[in-house]
Regions:
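Short, well-structured alpha-helical patches and their helix-loop capping segments
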Residues: 107-111, 118, 139, 143, ...
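"Short basic amphipathic alpha-helical interaction patches in structured regions
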Residues: 110-116, 130-134
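Short pre-active-site segment immediately N-terminal to the catalytic Zn-binding motif
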Residues: 97-114
Length: 199
């Protein structure tokens, strides 16, 4: 059995711990991500219902509203997000979900672009809101293709800096090969936060 640090004594692979370590390494090497404080980002995995390459691979959920506001108007009602807390009681500002095995069955490059795509949604102010672009499509700008090209550039720059080879080795494995090598895939599972009325 491998000495991979994400494998527990009971021979299960901690996927969410691994994903956090990949993001930690990316933030350390890419100055565009320096604003992200990972201790206030929660990582979770969701079992994808169908084993297909189509569909959602990952999502980033902001825990606050526009501008970092603690509440906002939705369908005429003022709502807030049911809060998540870290183990030391700090407010979680973002929730990163990866859909397994769909995410795991992407190529290494596709995994990197997907992770960076979600991290880039985090506001430069790191205030619990999304990065907002001008225009109607404020989430991905007016050109989602340009957004994805930028993520590919980030991925290539990260790889060019020779990051931890064990991270790259695991990223190169699909779900079947990952389980064959390291054991059952486990991790934190956090439900999507609820919107609740203020007051």
């Amino acid at each position: 059995m491998s000495t991979c640090p994400h494998v527990t004594e009971s021979h299960v692979f901690d996927f969410t711990a691994f994903l956090r370590d990949v993001c930690t390494d990316m933030i350390a090497r890419l100055p565009e991500l320096k604003h992200i404080e990972l201790s206030r980002v929660a990582f979770s995995f969701v079992r994808s219902r169908k084993r297909t390459s189509h569909g959602t691979q990952a999502t980033l959920t902001p825990m606050r509203f526009e501008g970092g506001a603690s509440s906002g108007i939705v369908d005429g009602q003022r709502l807030t997000v049911d809060p998540l807390r870290t183990v030391d009681g700090r407010e979680v500002l973002y929730l990163f979900h990866a859909y397994v095995p769909r995410f795991l069955d992407l190529s290494c490059e596709e995994k990197l672009v997907t992770i960076l795509h979600e991290l880039w949604h985090i506001s430069p102010q790191f205030n619990g809101d999304l990065r907002r672009f001008p225009g109607r499509n404020y989430v991905h700008s007016n050109s989602e293709a340009a957004y994805d090209r930028l993520m590919l550039e980030f991925a290539q720059r990260w790889r060019a800096q020779e990051p931890n080879q064990q991270l790259l080795e695991v990223l190169s494995l699909d779900s079947a090969r990952l389980q064959e090598r390291y054991g059952r895939v486990v991790g934190h599972r956090i439900a999507m936060p609820r919107l609740v009325p203020v007051g």
